[in-house]
């Protein structure tokens, strides 16, 4: 097994660290659940608007029309998917003065996992391809990706565990997002290698950024407020942004990104 592939596998596996952190101790309260959802929204917003979309637009040969167009397609694609799902909007699924029903959280977990997985898949490809061309650079990217994946795993596992009380279920959903990154690296190892088109990768990143922004604003933040109306979900959002921002600072400090 090649070193670039091992780096990609380890970076993706860091998601499980966050998942285990999300299920330690007693079942989280509604306040913790709401904070976790806000935390996840903060992660997605900062990654999408401060990392993925700018990186896509800065790609050589990428026009602003294509970049922003793919971002809008991602936004519209999310809302189209949301309308196709057989349930009401998540904040309508949480009964007043009751615990949030597991079904609504499960649906949110599916969408959250989908959004993070779509982000992680090209990230896995990028980690492998970069490490293949420059091993030192690959080590730095793998480290930054692992730092990203730990809070992402926590953000998925926390809400699912709070809703179901099942550690296995929480780790399962969190693990899917990490496996998407591993799958991207394996696919690059088997098929793509250094032939990944920068324009195609940039277009995918822009669209995924749109999906993640829509998911954060329309799904996660309203549900967090509905679950715990006495507290502001913005605290979780700001905390998630801070954690992701710190990882980006580390990334820039080591000369990457």
UniProtKB/Swiss-Prot annotation:
Compartments where found: Cell inner membrane
Record field: catalytic activity: Zn(2+)(in) = Zn(2+)(out)
InterPro entries cross-referenced by the UniProt entry: ZIP (IPR003689), Zn_transptr_ZupT (IPR023498)
Record field: transmembrane: 5-25, 32-52, 61-81, 182-202, 203-223, 236-256
Regions annotated as coiled coil: none
Protease as UniProt keyword: no
Residues reported in the UniProt entry to bind Fe(2+): 120, 123, 149, 152, 181
GO cellular component terms, semicolon-separated: plasma membrane
UniProt KW keywords: Cell inner membrane, Cell membrane, Ion transport, Iron, Membrane, Metal-binding, Transmembrane, Transmembrane helix, Transport, Zinc, Zinc transport
Record-linked Pfam families: Zip
NCBIfam families per record: PRK04201.1
Name assigned to this protein: Zinc transporter ZupT
Highest classification ranks of the organism: Bacteria, Pseudomonadati, Pseudomonadota, Gammaproteobacteria, Enterobacterales
Gene name as annotated: zupT
């Amino acid at each position: 097994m090649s070193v670039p592939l091992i780096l990609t596998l380890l970076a993706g596996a860091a998601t499980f660290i966050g998942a285990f952190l999300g299920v330690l101790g007693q079942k989280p309260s509604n306040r913790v659940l709401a904070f976790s959802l806000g935390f996840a929204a903060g992660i997605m917003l900062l990654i999408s608007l401060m990392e993925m979309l700018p990186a896509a637009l800065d790609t050589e040969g990428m026009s602003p029309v294509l970049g922003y167009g793919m971002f809008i397609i991602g936004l519209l694609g999310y809302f189209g998917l949301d309308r196709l799902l057989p349930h009401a909007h998540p904040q309508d699924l949480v009964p007043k003065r009751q615990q949030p029903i597991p079904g609504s959280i499960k649906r949110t977990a599916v969408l959250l996992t989908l959004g993070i997985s779509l982000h992680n898949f090209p990230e896995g490809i990028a980690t492998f391809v970069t490490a293949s061309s420059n091993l030192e650079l690959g080590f730095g990217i793998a480290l930054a990706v692992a730092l990203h994946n730990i809070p992402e795993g926590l953000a998925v596992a926390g809400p699912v565990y709070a809703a179901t009380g099942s550690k296995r279920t929480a780790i399962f959903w969190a693990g899917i997002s990490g496996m998407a990154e591993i799958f991207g690296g394996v696919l690059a190892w088997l098929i793509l290698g250094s032939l990944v088109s920068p324009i195609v990768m940039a277009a995918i990143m822009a669209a995924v950024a749109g999906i993640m922004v829509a998911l954060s604003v329309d799904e996660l933040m309203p549900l967090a407020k509905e679950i715990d109306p006495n507290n502001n979900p913005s605290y979780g959002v700001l905390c998630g942004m801070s954690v992701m921002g710190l990882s980006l600072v580390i990334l820039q400090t080591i000369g990457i990104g």
